Amino acid sequence: MATIKDVARLAGVSTTTVSHVINKTRFVAETTQEKVMEAVKQLNYAPSAVARSLKCNTTRTIGMLVTQSTNLFFSEVIDGVESYCYRQGYTLILCNTGGIYEKQRDYIRMLAEKRVDGILVMCSDLTQELQDMLDAHKDIPKVVMDWGPETSHADKIIDNSEEGGYLATKYLTDRGHTEIACLSGHFVKAACQERIQGFRRAMAEAKLTVNEDWILEGNFECDTAVLAADKIIAMDKRPTAVFCFNDTMALGLMSRLQQKGIRIPEDMSVIGYDNIELAEYFSPPLTTVHQPKRRVGKNAFEILLERIKDKEHERRIFEMHPEIVERDTVKDLTKS
């Protein structure tokens, strides 16, 4: 592996001159710059990031903790973060924790050892252990995204799940639906509790009674949506609409209902949450609640950069606002 001395020897200059050319820290004659860069090219020389980080006290590296990078919502946010990291010359270290305490602990320790400039946190498990681990590294700038834990030492981006739950339910009630079911994720998750609160608020506003038996628990994956669909099919009295707390479960639910001869939206309406890229390609295309996932990723990275530059800034909370994307899975009963 070539060293800076090899470059200097081939270019016929000092190592100091090579350093100034590469780092653009001092004027160097154009002809000399060309010699140095030609030597760099010939030797395939790459400056030591470790040495540079020791000198500049920055690694230009960001760590990101996520529960599951294969989750379609998370993957689109990650794509936004990675895109903006690349544009700004930062490397992203993605840590897929699976919600496992040991992995969270080990990844946070590893990121600290690698002297990352900051950490983005997007973990759906609201554990005290994770909060304590993050708080133990007060010197590392952090931004908590979406479902992440509350911590006094990190900026936070909140997705307004209560508002999203309200908008989805109001969309259904405005179209004449009075018998509405919910397919939630795990009830213990804060986002699910908030969406249920929004659902209840919209139902109360429309002076409708909530059927508690129609609030079903899933896990944000297709398998539990299929089980929920089977429960709905077996009901003596079925809801006219189902509000799914993410698009993945909406897909699983719709698929199972259609397999059993229940037409969407003619026989049952479905509204999702997230507006993942696949939602418009469902059959029929899914009406859903849009979350600006790539903008969340961009904003999180920009906020983290501000925190890196000003570590003493008071804690900030940024709100995102969901909106309805109207497609073809909700029947308007007022026109029947």
Curated annotation (Swiss-Prot):
Pathway: Purine metabolism; purine nucleotide biosynthesis [regulation]. One of its GO terms (biological process) is regulation of DNA-templated transcription. Hypoxanthine binds at F73, K189, F220, D274. Keywords: DNA-binding, Purine biosynthesis, Repressor, Transcription, Transcription regulation. Residues 4-23, 48-56 bind DNA. The keyword Cytoplasm does not apply. Coiled coil: none annotated. SUPFAM superfamilies: lambda repressor-like DNA-binding domains, Periplasmic binding protein-like I. One of its GO terms (molecular function) is transcription cis-regulatory region binding. Residues 2-56 form the HTH lacI-type domain. Homodimer. This is HTH-type transcriptional repressor PurR. It comes from Vibrio cholerae serotype O1 (strain ATCC 39315 / El Tor Inaba N16961). The lineage of its organism: Bacteria, Pseudomonadati, Pseudomonadota, Gammaproteobacteria, Vibrionales. The gene is purR.
